[in-house]
Amino acid sequence: MTPVRLLVTGGAGFIGANFVRYWTRNHPRDHVVAYDLLTYAGNLANLDDVRHRIAFVRGDIGDLEGAERTLREHHIDVVVNFAAESHNSLAVLDPGRFFRTNVIGTQTLLEAARRAGGIARFHHISTCEVYGDLDLDTDEMFHEDSPYRPRTPYNASKAGSDHAVRAYYETFGLPVTITNCCNNYGPYQFPEKVIPLFTCNAIDDQPLPLYASTRNRREWLHVVDHCRAVEAVLLEGRVGETYHVGSGVERSIAEIADVVLAELGKPESLKTIVPDRPGHDRRYLLDSSKIGRELGWKATIPFEQGMAETVKWYVDNRAWWQPLMDRAPVEEGTAWEEPVDAQSLDL
């Protein structure tokens, strides 16, 4: 295959950095540019082991001139858009920030790609949360043609970004694809998210905060399986199509806490109930049969194995996560804007 030149936005974040690492390992002839604003969840340390093999540009997807300039200077032909604000609880506190980044930012990046020209694929990463939620006591799941029913500012902002991507395909012919994914876990995940938060707290014998709605369930996918899915869509996916990326593995938040405590040999007394957040969705589950049928993809990392490896990674990499837990609040607009609240979790 002819080498390609990829721009990976959000490339210093959790999933983006894992994707950069995955792609450079499996496609060593390709030129990869990680593009990231380095807000609080972006971290250049996530790319330490591949920095010598990639280019890095600190940039904002909401900066039309900067994004277009980067696309032109690096002769980009594939854009993979991981850039997003994704913390549900912060979205309740500051909805405007999420709509600016996730909707306006995505539209601006699309426009930059349209103006730069030469884009063979614009791939957009989205979430199962755009569909709303499902009843706990049902076997229903979301399909690619399920209606959008977002219930929170974050969900609505991601839904808006999806619509912008489709509009640029229908109106301007930009060759796009979209994947909607379930909850990811794995190494380098910022410790505002539930699995690293539980793990880091438990390592230090600190409480594991569980929302009062402990029965709420999520579908869990290892980040490497997600990277494989995006690879499959980039290589073989049909332009204009949406593909769901899920594992079929559902666990409640209480069950996640139990797994973490068992892996670390910590007592259940560390679990503590905290007030629920507004708009907390009950359940998500994706029908991922389309990507399996058309592209031959399926999740391959068993949940138990993936969780054991993930917990061990955090045990072995305190030097990576401890500074994030300790970071004090700084002024708006600097590289790091939010400290980790050890009593708050994001799902």
Model-derived regions: residue spans:
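Short aromatic-enriched loop/helix-cap "lid" or pocket-rim segments at secondary-structure transitions
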Residues: L44-L47, L134-T138, Q189-E192, I256-D258, ...
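The catalytic Tyr-centered alpha-helix of NAD(P)H-dependent dehydrogenases
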Residues: D139, P150-S157, P187, P191-I195, ...
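Generic structural signal for helix capping and beta-alpha/helix-loop junctions
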Residues: G42, G132, G186, R218, ...
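Hydrophobic alpha-helix immediately C-terminal to the catalytic Tyr-X-X-X-Lys motif of short-chain
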Residues: G160, A164-Y168, F198, I256, ...
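C-terminal substrate-binding subdomain of Rossmann-fold SDR/epimerase-dehydratase oxidoreductases
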Residues: F19, G59-G62, P196, A202-L347
